[in-house]
């Protein structure tokens, strides 16, 4: 029988990877709920974000995205990070390419529209004061698809389901409140 040993360095790197992944998840939840304060926790102070529609201070992006989404009629959205390649460039730095899929329902002059966007977040992460967060982000869009929405809020069994919201009235806030 062979025994396997894992070094403390390997354990520490695993913890670092998990901290980076957790940061990516905070970003997704923050942007989906249009929660600027939660969104800011994904970025170091002074970080930058280039999203095309916005290129500048990441904390300003966190304040910008809610009013911007409202101005284009966003009613619901889901950001997913499906997988991420994390390469450490030093003890406290990493570059991360994470694949993103976003689903958006928006109210337009022609009715509800559905968009799917596939892209990647190209991030420079840094660990400062023990916290892994984004220092710089570039969003790269690889493809998109736009079509009339077939969203059905009232039909069949949908009418009785709890509804997701893009604000702090979403059901998840009550569930997660003791932990935040």
Regions found by a protein language model. Give the residues of each.
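A solvent-exposed, acidic/Ser-Thr-rich amphipathic alpha-helical stretch
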Residues: 36-104
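Acidic/histidine-enriched, glycine/proline-rich intrinsically disordered or flexible terminal extensions
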Residues: 147-180
